[in-house]
């Protein structure tokens, strides 16, 4: 094989590896953004229901805690007393 052919094959392999790495990073970021949108939507819904009725929806709070994976720890104050 000629040196130019070897270089072309090596460049093709490197390009394929780079494409796999880039698309993997894009997919991971897409999942992170999608999860953040669901969290933001639930936060908005909980806030809206709290303003309307004076209390949060327990189901929404459970969904949020599953998404955040922190149990009932949330970035806002929760008065369960």
From Swiss-Prot:
Subcellular location, record wording: Host membrane
One Gene Ontology cellular component annotation held by this UniProt entry: membrane
Comment text on domains: The N-terminus and transmembrane domains are required for self-oligomerization and proper virion budding, whereas the cytoplasmic domain is required for CD4 degradation. The cytoplasmic domain is composed of 2 amphipathic alpha helix that form a U-shape.
Pfam families linked: Vpu (PF00558)
Domain of life: Viruses
Additional remarks: HIV-1 lineages are divided in three main groups, M (for Major), O (for Outlier), and N (for New, or Non-M, Non-O). The vast majority of strains found worldwide belong to the group M. Group O seems to be endemic to and largely confined to Cameroon and neighboring countries in West Central Africa, where these viruses represent a small minority of HIV-1 strains. The group N is represented by a limited number of isolates from Cameroonian persons. The group M is further subdivided in 9 clades or subtypes (A to D, F to H, J and K).
Membrane topology: Single-pass type I membrane protein
Residue positions where Phosphoserine is found in the record: 53, 57
Extracellular topology ranges: 1-7
Record-given protein name: Protein Vpu
Post-translational modification: Phosphorylated by host CK2. This phosphorylation is necessary for interaction with human BTRC and degradation of CD4.
Function: Enhances virion budding by targeting host CD4 and Tetherin/BST2 to proteasome degradation. Degradation of CD4 prevents any unwanted premature interactions between viral Env and its host receptor CD4 in the endoplasmic reticulum. Degradation of antiretroviral protein Tetherin/BST2 is important for virion budding, as BST2 tethers new viral particles to the host cell membrane. Mechanistically, Vpu bridges either CD4 or BST2 to BTRC, a substrate recognition subunit of the Skp1/Cullin/F-box protein E3 ubiquitin ligase, induces their ubiquitination and subsequent proteasomal degradation.
Keyword Transmembrane helix applies: yes
Protein source organism: Human immunodeficiency virus type 1 group M subtype D (isolate ELI) (HIV-1)
Keyword annotations from UniProtKB, A to Z: AIDS, Apoptosis, Host membrane, Host-virus interaction, Inhibition of host innate immune response by virus, Inhibition of host tetherin by virus, Ion channel, Ion transport, Membrane, Phosphoprotein, Transmembrane, Transmembrane helix, Transport, Viral immunoevasion
Subunit architecture: Homopentamer. Interacts with host CD4 and BRTC; these interactions induce proteasomal degradation of CD4. Interacts with host BST2; this interaction leads to the degradation of host BST2. Interacts with host FBXW11. Interacts with host AP1M1; this interaction plays a role in the mistrafficking and subsequent degradation of host BST2. Interacts with host RANBP2; this interaction allows Vpu to down-regulate host BLM sumoylation.
Cytoplasmic side stretches: 29-81
Membership in a protein family: Belongs to the HIV-1 VPU protein family.
Activity: how regulated: Ion channel activity is inhibited by hexamethylene amiloride in vitro.
